[in-house]
Amino acid sequence: MYSRLFFSILFFLGCCPALFADTDSPQRATFGQPAVMLGIAIVFFYFILWRPEQKRRQAMEKRKSELAVGDKVTAMGIVGTIAEIREHTVILNIASGKIEILKAAISEILKAEK
């Protein structure tokens, strides 16, 4: 019931400019309104999507640079404890032995085991 009323009001409001438009004056192509809307969309995406992701990525890179032997990490669903740190890779102790993974593959850094 209310949805029909809501959509009827939206339809009417959408048609209002067409109903009351001055048909004698020629339509002018304006660059301003689409440019403003595009600018608003870009600002919206920057502050809502790109900026928080950039901050999260920088924080994760900082945490990866501070990795230490004994830290517990997850990589591709594998949970392990860091046994050795190399330039681009990390050796993890897991239940059945050791594996070598890339630092870039580490998705989460858990608390160090003490």
From Swiss-Prot:
Protein topology in the membrane: Single-pass membrane protein
Q: Where in the cell is it found?
A: Cell inner membrane
Which PROSITE patterns does the annotation name? PROKAR_LIPOPROTEIN
| Residue ranges of the TM segments | 30-50
Give the InterPro entries listed for this entry: Preprotein_translocase_YajC
Which keywords are on file for this protein?
Answer: Cell inner membrane, Cell membrane, Membrane, Protein transport, Translocation, Transmembrane, Transmembrane helix, Transport
Q: Which GO terms describe its cellular component?
A: plasma membrane
The main place the protein resides is membrane
Enumerate the Gene Ontology biological process terms. protein transport
UniProt KW Nucleotide-binding keyword: no
Quaternary data: Part of the SecDF-YidC-YajC translocase complex. The SecDF-YidC-YajC translocase forms a supercomplex with SecYEG, called the holo-translocon (HTL).
Q: Which NCBIfam families match?
A: yajC
Q: What does this protein do?
A: The SecYEG-SecDF-YajC-YidC holo-translocon (HTL) protein secretase/insertase is a supercomplex required for protein secretion, insertion of proteins into membranes, and assembly of membrane protein complexes. While the SecYEG complex is essential for assembly of a number of proteins and complexes, the SecDF-YajC-YidC subcomplex facilitates these functions.
Q: Which family does it belong to?
A: Belongs to the YajC family.
Record-given protein name = Sec translocon accessory complex subunit YajC
Please tell me the species this chain comes from.
Chlamydia trachomatis serovar D (strain ATCC VR-885 / DSM 19411 / UW-3/Cx)
The primary gene name is yajC
